[in-house]
């Protein structure tokens, strides 16, 4: 069993039960899924760029991403509907906990001038979105093999009803929020 999952069941659940006065264990918010999205703008001119992004995302997440396509044509960006423009991967269960553990303990501390993640990135429904400026913070990415520095969005979807509950949940999991 994963370290974080065990911590959730043994420590976090009772702590949240007492803090928010839940009547049932099923009311306690939990992390439902983590979605990692990489937008590759250069894929319009250069289809090789997308292959590299997919390869890197596979290494980071540990599973094969799905290629996202343009919903609309935008003439200004020379974009046609249906063109591949990015990749995303949805993690659930064991892999989700593995990735979150790695993100909090290894990757985020490797960010330059890191002072904690923003408290304002909640969406009002208990989900948290985190933007990463470069993929090099992940230990799986080999610095020498990187063709281009790419950012990504990491969305942590929780079952919490309010931002306050979600913030408390992520703080208990060890998410380093700004003071």
Curated annotation (Swiss-Prot):
GO biological process, one term: translation
Pfam families in the record: Ribosomal_L5, Ribosomal_L5_C
A single GO molecular function term of this UniProt record: rRNA binding
Cellular compartments per GO CC: ribonucleoprotein complex; ribosome
Keyword tags: Ribonucleoprotein, Ribosomal protein, RNA-binding, rRNA-binding, tRNA-binding
Family of the protein in this entry: Belongs to the universal ribosomal protein uL5 family.
Subunit structure: Part of the 50S ribosomal subunit; part of the 5S rRNA/L5/L18/L25 subcomplex. Contacts the 5S rRNA and the P site tRNA. Forms a bridge to the 30S subunit in the 70S ribosome.
HAMAP family: Ribosomal_uL5_B
Role description: This is one of the proteins that bind and probably mediate the attachment of the 5S RNA into the large ribosomal subunit, where it forms part of the central protuberance. In the 70S ribosome it contacts protein S13 of the 30S subunit (bridge B1b), connecting the 2 subunits; this bridge is implicated in subunit movement. Contacts the P site tRNA; the 5S rRNA and some of its associated proteins might help stabilize positioning of ribosome-bound tRNAs.
Name listed for the protein in its UniProt record: Large ribosomal subunit protein uL5
Protein's organism: Bacillus cytotoxicus (strain DSM 22905 / CIP 110041 / 391-98 / NVH 391-98)
